[in-house]
Amino acid sequence: MVYLAAKDIMTRNVVTVRKGTSIEGAARLMAEHDVSGLPVVDGEGHLVGMLSESDILLKGLHAPSEMRGSTPGLFAPQPDAVDEAHRRAQSECVEDAMTTDVVVFSEESPVANIAQAMIEHAINRVPIVDGRRVVGIVSRKDVVRAIAAGTGDEYDPDQHVGRVIKL
């Protein structure tokens, strides 16, 4: 079986967002860098959570009562509901919307194990960590590219198992 490690496919220059950043600021960072999720780090650069587009949408859709229960794109919310969602995005911080149960892997972890975790936990990206410092990120797109490339060595699927950590 082909062995590719996280370090072989991960993005090394990871765009992160600092704890305390507004949700609006994080959304702008995502748009600017064309990413759908960001590791959230503290002042020392330690991972404290993950923020995804879904987290932002869920926070925004659950904020104003006028938008609850409606289907996005099917029914237009009242203008004041959109304004309220925008105000909240400006005033609330990433830690109000981020996920703190984060699946993480090390640089040596097999890509096959990362792919399995993505399926099991219904996640689109996993941070690659050294201790609690983010050294890379692997997205589903990275895994698909690795499958398409089809290169690597033999691997033992029981090595380098990922873990879910409560941050």
Question: What is each model feature region?
Answer:
Residues 49-52, 57, 137-144:
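Short hydrophobic beta-strand motif reused across regulatory alpha/beta modules
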Residues 1-29, 35, 40-43, 47-48, ...:
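Bateman/CBS regulatory modules and CBS-like beta-alpha motifs in cytosolic regions of diverse proteins
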Residues 58-61, 110-113, 122, 133, ...:
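Contiguous N-terminal and early-domain "leader" segments and peripheral loops that mark the onset or edge
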Residues 57-72, 144-157:
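A short, polar/charged loop-to-alpha-helix boundary motif
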Residues 122, 127-151:
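A contiguous, mid-protein "functional segment" used to position or interact
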